[in-house]
Amino acid sequence: MIRVLESLGRDFTIVFITGRWAMGQAKVDAFIDNLLPNIKKIVFCKPHDYPGTTAEYKLAQIKELESDGYKFYMGLDDHSAVIGLLHNHGMFVAKVISD
């Protein structure tokens, strides 16, 4: 993972979109900052009062970010058959590979 990040250079932002974490947004932010210091990142933690599923929340956040000009290239989820970067429903988002 570190090699992938190093090959990207410094002109990128990692977006984490997570499900409901009992610890709350502030602790999720601190947890991810501790994992990846000195790397630009945005963290979205699904609020407890969000009416939809975690998948719906993640897709809604991606659509909103894309409308703000972000470009997503790859999406990885811990429940994916491919790879997991965070436990407990964490997701590193850069492009949703499939609907």
What are these model-predicted stretches?
Residues G9-F16, E66-F72:
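Short, surface-exposed connector motifs at secondary-structure boundaries
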Residues F12, K41, M91-F92:
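A structural micro-motif
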Residues I17, C45-K46, V96-D99:
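Conserved beta-strand termini and adjacent loop/short-helix elements that scaffold enzyme active sites
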